[in-house]
Swiss-Prot record:
Keywords: Cell cycle, DNA-binding, Nucleus, Repressor, Transcription, Transcription regulation. It comes from Xenopus tropicalis (Western clawed frog). It is found in: Nucleus. SUPFAM superfamilies: Winged helix' DNA-binding domain. This is Forkhead box protein N3. SMART domains: FH. One of its GO terms (cellular component) is nucleus. Residues 316-336 have a biased composition (Low complexity). Its main location: nucleus. Acts as a transcriptional repressor. May be involved in DNA damage-inducible cell cycle arrests (checkpoints). Coiled coil: none annotated. Residues 389-401 have a biased composition (Basic residues). Residues 1-53, 85-108, 294-337, 381-428 are annotated as: Disordered.
């Protein structure tokens, strides 16, 4: 339903609809015709308000379309090009590139906010220092020196820098040197594990002047040398010194920190792939080879720990190290351990021979002592008559016993194991001690009775 106009303002010409007029005014491609016919006065809206609310929702005032040309000009070129795609009607020249595609220059636009995050600003400040570590106050000074915008900016940007330093994993604290006098605060450096992430964040800035170089990577490795990317903004001392940071092609960034040719990117230092872990792996391989040989050969007088993977927690690592040792690098790393093992094996073999001879002589003396003790015990038992009775009891018990194979499982479990020689020796020793105790008791009793008799005799003699 089109706008309702009073009879005095109705257009005389027929065949022109309101929709076609709105289309003409919205496109702004052709000059407007019949200004008298398209004049929509403000009272038209007031009349409709008196008629009802339903018609008011459907009607809109289109007077602002006539002033669109002046409104767009009043916004200015910078806002217009970055926000609205509508261009000046009278200008027939092709549109200029957007302001976001232009490189950022702090000298030309000192009041313009830089397009970098605070983590990128901190990264650039630390990398620009010769020692690759800075206190917080020096980071502030670097940002103020290279970006004049922050001189007049609110003071909250310093808090943002501090929060990024303390909360971001890319930055870590470093101990101060005694020679440095930086005052209060601690030094901050970049964690090498997250350095590549910061480089990627710098490359993703929308103000990069040569973003097409990263979007279309070269096909051949030789083309990497020719695609040299200038710094993000001209005249920067940081990128004059460390310009190679942002000259890494996208193929290298997508594949991580792997660099195809170190000669091409001399300024880029790839991330270390845990050198401590590599050293530990080589040492582990050498120890594992030594351990497996010691398991196969007799030990140097010490007992073998275990060959069961459940008992030995290093078993799996030793087996995996043996599989890895087939490579040439592992054989080189384990060569020194093999030399040490051969020398130790010779010494252990010589020591084992000496210890074995001494052990044999010591065992022979022990056996002779045991035989003598057994003979003495048997002689003492024969004198007491205990041995004959003990032998008879053992013989009767053997006759009464049922073979263990014929017993059920429960009785087999409850059945006590046969007494060993050590237990027999213990029983014999106990019986001897018991007999000795009885004899001592009898001797004491006889001595007491004898003393009592003597005392009585002495008393009787004294009375007489």
């Amino acid at each position: 339903m089109g706008p309702i106009m009073p009879p005095s303002k109705k257009p005389e010409s027929t065949g022109i609809s309101v929709s076609s007029q709105c289309y003409r005014s919205s496109t702004l491609s052709n000059p407007l015709h019949d200004d008298d016919d398209l004049d929509f006065p403000p009272p038209a809206v007031k009349i409709n308000k008196e008629k009802g609310g339903m018609e008011d929702e459907e009607l809109t005032n289109l007077n602002w379309l006539h002033e669109s040309k002046n409104l767009l000009k009043s916004f200015g070129d910078t806002v217009l090009r970055s926000v609205s795609p509508v261009q000046d009607i009278d200008d027939d020249t092709p549109p200029s590139p957007a302001q976001s595609d232009m490189p950022y220059d702090a000298k030309q636009n000192p009041n313009c906010k830089p397009p970098y995050s605070f983590s990128c600003l901190i990264f650039m400040a630390i990398e620009d220092s010769p020692t690759k570590r800075l206190p917080v106050k020096d980071i502030y000074n670097w940002i103020l020196e290279h970006f004049p915008y922050f001189a007049n900016a609110p003071t909250g940007w310093k808090n943002s820098v501090r929060h990024n330093l303390s909360l971001n994993k890319c930055f870590k604290k470093v101990d101060k040197d005694r020679s440095q006098s930086i005052g209060k605060g601690s030094l901050w450096c970049i964690d090498p594990e997250y350095r590549q992430n910061l480089i990627q964040a710098l490359k993703k800035t929308p103000y990069h002047p040569y973003s097409h170089v990263f979007n279309t990577p070269p096909t051949s490795p030789q083309a990497y040398q020719s695609t040299s990317v200038p710094p993000l903004w001209p005249g920067s001392t940081f990128f004059k010194k460390n310009g190679a940071l942002l000259q890494v092609p996208p193929g290298v960034i997508q594949n991580g920190a792997r660099v195809l040719n170190r000669g091409i990117f001399s300024g880029v230092r790839p991330l270390p792939i845990n050198p401590i872990g590599a050293m530990a792996a080589s040492v582990r391989n050498g120890i594992a080879n030594c351990r497996t040989r010691m398991e196969s050969e007799p030990s140097c007088g010490s007992p073998l720990v275990s060959s069961d993977p459940k008992d030995d927690h290093n078993y799996s690592s030793a087996k995996s190290a043996n599989k890895r040792s087939s490579s040439p690098s592992d054989s080189i790393s384990s060569s020194s351990a093999d030399d040490h093992y051969e020398f130790a094996a010779k010494v252990c073999r010589e020591g084992s021979d000496i210890s074995f001879q001494s052990h044999e002589s010591f065992s022979e003396t022990e056996e002779e002592d045991k035989k003598q003790i057994k003979k003495e015990l048997k002689d003492s038992l024969v004198e007491s008559g205990y041995s004959s009775q003990h032998k008879k009891k053992q013989h009767l018990l053997k006759l009464r016993r049922i073979p263990s194979d014929a017993l059920p499982l429960k009785k087999r479990r409850t059945e006590k194991p046969p007494e060993s020689d050590d237990e027999e020796m213990k029983e014999a020793a106990g019986s001897l001690l018991h007999l000795a105790g009885i004899r001592s008791c009898l001797n004491n009793i006889t001595n007491r009775t004898a003393k009592g008799q003597k005392e009585q005799k002495d008393k009787e003699t004294t009375k007489n």
